[in-house]
């Protein structure tokens, strides 16, 4: 780990674990107001402190098929439910966000229809997900979930927090198209490459990841090969 720490210090001195969630948190905070009612779509057990917005809005609700959501400490209410059938009334939320959820959806169009339904007019949807043209999702699609669980355990992540992936709304084009089909208005899609987390276990792979990050970050026409996709859409005001 000594050489890896040295590479961390030299190339990514300002990075820390879950740097992508720090970026997403900042994006969410720019869209949350003090009196907002917010839905964390795919809230899970509450293992990511960056997704705690209790001090910045009125209430945060959460849904997830994982029953641990009911004990998520960041939520006013956590409900075991799927995104295809959100258990809340029409026009209920000011903001809906999904952190590392979109890649797991087998029917993203259905989920976005539900997002549209529960958002108030003018409400905002934000999603953070891997870009499917990056090498990590490409490898993921060629390997079974059992491999993902094993590799994530090597990285220090619990197997129960690794889920099957579909990558059906994981590029800029798909995000724009599926949002429009659900009557949501796409506002922006950011594509970002950062510290290569999945390659940091070994020096040789880490060096490759650093070179890749430098290239795709500096050449704009390679932006579609960056790892992180953050999409923002809005429910039109009637």
Segment roles from a protein language model:
Residues 106-114, 124-237:
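S-adenosyl-L-methionine-dependent methyltransferase catalytic module, highlighting the catalytic core
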Residues 37, 122-124:
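Short glycine-centered segments of the SAM/dcSAM-binding site in methyltransferase folds
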Residues 33, 105-106, 119-121:
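Helix-to-beta-strand junctions that scaffold the AdoMet/dcAdoMet cofactor pocket
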Residues 1-89, 95-97, 191, 210, ...:
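Conserved N-terminal segment of class I S-adenosyl-L-methionine
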């Amino acid at each position: 780990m000594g050489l890896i720490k040295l590479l961390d210090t030299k190339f990514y001195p300002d990075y820390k674990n879950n740097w992508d969630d720090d970026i997403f948190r900042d994006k969410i905070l720019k869209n949350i107001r003090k009196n907002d009612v917010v839905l964390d779509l795919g809230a899970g057990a509450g293992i990511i402190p960056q997704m705690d917005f209790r001090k910045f809005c009125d209430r945060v609700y959460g849904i997830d098929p994982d029953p641990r959501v009911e004990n998520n400490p960041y939520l006013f209410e956590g409900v075991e439910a799927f995104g295809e059938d959100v258990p809340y009334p029409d026009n209920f939320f000011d903001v809906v966000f999904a952190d590392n959820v979109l890649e797991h959806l087998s029917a993203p169009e259905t989920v976005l229809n539900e997002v549209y339904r529960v958002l108030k007019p003018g409400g905002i949807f934000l999603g953070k997900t891997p870009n499917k043209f990056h090498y990590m999702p490409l490898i993921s699609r060629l390997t079974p979930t059992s491999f993902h669980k094993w590799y994530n355990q090597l990285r220090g992540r619990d197997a129960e927090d690794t889920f099957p992936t579909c990558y059906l709304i994981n590029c800029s084009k798909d995000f724009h198209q599926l949002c429009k089909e659900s009557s949501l208005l796409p506002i922006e899609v950011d594509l970002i490459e950062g510290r290569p987390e999945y390659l940091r276990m070994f020096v040789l792979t880490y060096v490759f990841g650093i070179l890749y990050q430098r290239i795709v970050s500096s050449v704009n026409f390679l932006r579609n090969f960056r790892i992180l996709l953050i999409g923002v859409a809005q429910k039109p005001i009637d």
